[in-house]
Curated annotation (Swiss-Prot):
Residues 18-39 are annotated as: Disordered. It comes from Ureaplasma urealyticum serovar 10 (strain ATCC 33699 / Western). The keyword Endoplasmic reticulum does not apply. PANTHER family: LARGE RIBOSOMAL SUBUNIT PROTEIN BL27M (PTHR15893:SF0), RIBOSOMAL PROTEIN L27 (PTHR15893). Keywords: Ribonucleoprotein, Ribosomal protein. InterPro entries: Ribosomal_bL27, Ribosomal_bL27_CS. This is Large ribosomal subunit protein bL27. It comes from the Bacteria. One of its GO terms (cellular component) is cytosolic large ribosomal subunit. The gene is rpmA. GO terms for biological process: translation. Pfam families: Ribosomal_L27.
């Protein structure tokens, strides 16, 4: 038998059976977006009021906005949500009156 013929006629079989793999089965971590303080609740300076992607709710009086659009209180007071320009909403912090 020709040695060259024997090498070209070699057939290899799988040592492990091929198993289908699913392309599903993963999910992103929760981002915990939304209101952290409701209308009428008291807040401290620096406390997060609303976490959002984009401007769903706009900052009003005494409210700052972070680079990820998070709204936070600049001063201590009471949270107040109001509508403006028809369908838009803004949140403000009204300072507490000091009773002396």
């Amino acid at each position: 038998m020709n040695k060259l013929y024997w090498l070209t006629d070699l057939q290899l079989f799988a040592s492990k059976k091929g198993v289908d793999s699913s392309k599903n089965g993963r999910d992103s971590n929760p981002k915990y977006l939304g209101a952290k303080l409701g209308d009428g609740q008291s807040t401290k300076a620096g406390q997060i009021i609303y976490r959002q992607r984009g401007n769903k709710i706009y900052p009003g009086l005494n409210v700052g906005q972070g680079k990820d659009h998070t709204l936070f209180a600049k001063t201590a007071g009471v949270v107040k949500y109001t509508k403006f320009m028809g369908d838009k909403t803004k949140v403000s912090v009204l300072p507490k009156e000091d009773n002396k």
